[in-house]
From Swiss-Prot:
Gene Ontology cellular component list: plasma membrane
InterPro entries: ArAE_1
Family statement: Belongs to the UPF0421 family.
Main location (coarse class): membrane
Protein's membrane topology: Multi-pass membrane protein
Segments passing through the bilayer: 19-39, 74-94, 109-129, 131-151
Keyword tags: Cell membrane, Membrane, Transmembrane, Transmembrane helix
Protein name: UPF0421 protein BA_2743/GBAA_2743/BAS2557
Source organism superkingdom: Bacteria
Species classification: Bacteria, Bacillati, Bacillota, Bacilli, Bacillales
Pfam families named among the record's database cross-references: ArAE_1
Localization: Cell membrane
Amino acid sequence: MNQVRKWNIIGGRVIKTGIAVFLTVLVCEFFNIPTIFAVITAIVTIEPTATDSIKKGLVRFPASTIGSAYAMTFTFFLGHQALSYALAAMFTIVTCQKLRLHAGTLVATLTAVAMIPITADHYFTAFLIRLATTSTGIIVSTVVNFFILPPHYVKTISGCTEELFVKTANIMEEWLTALMDGKVIIKETTYNLSKLTVLLHKAVQFVQYEQKDWKYHRHTKKEMRSFLLVQKQLHLLQQIIYHIDNLARAPIETCDWSQNEKEILRRTIHSIISILRNHCEEIDEEHFKLIDELDKQFWTNKNDLAHCKPNQYHHHFSSKSIILFEVLSIHDMLEELKQIFEKYESENQLNCSVH
């Protein structure tokens, strides 16, 4: 399993930041303008996607313009006093928020307070120079983010998806152990489930990043199919994790299973674990037989509950029915995952035969 590298110190974004800073300084030195504000802007303009760099760059430029204008105005009237810093920061923040320039508020405020101590006269000229340095930082960073090491998250998403399959299977195994022992879910399982949810959200975020830049870069049909596959897999894994979370919250200790019921459930869960670890590429006939047995159990429990008197039971589902329902729901997701994988494989084979 190719897991996502957790300790990758120098990634593409770090390298691009260094390149952007280097080029920004060269441009500033060529035009003989101050470098510090251009460098600050260049650093914050490097975003996870080129799309975000462009969008936020268009926000940060007017925001920095506002900050520079306030800084020069208050310095002109009040000089280098504490009140000038405070008013420049306050007015910059309020104006940016009112104009919905949220992405540029921080940079604009830093620009405003940093300009005050280094400007003694020629305020309008200093203001124009600041616009030039800000523009330089934004343009250089956007160009670097767009053309140098453009973000490609498909491999990262695939790694996250593989890890999700394995970790989902592991949590199912932990839950099965608790079920067989008739004990409450331990804290470690709950913690692992929360970590699994974090990993899922991370993978979904990478999908969103990839979609944002999809229109700017060329992709082969195979890459597009791979991306659509992992996107659909993540959507279904999200539903599986939701059902597992419900299983973890089900009151296991109140269930009264017969030996036969317990054995069928155990074998079914083991089969689900095996399928997940195999990335749902194959589901054997034995698994479907177990699901049929489980389905019969579910409806038997549901019908038995329907005959209970109101004063004996007030819930529509017993603990056993809830557990069976969640397991059957997980099976439905596994079937969908298998169909998606089969479609992906058939399209790949068809494409290979054409070429």
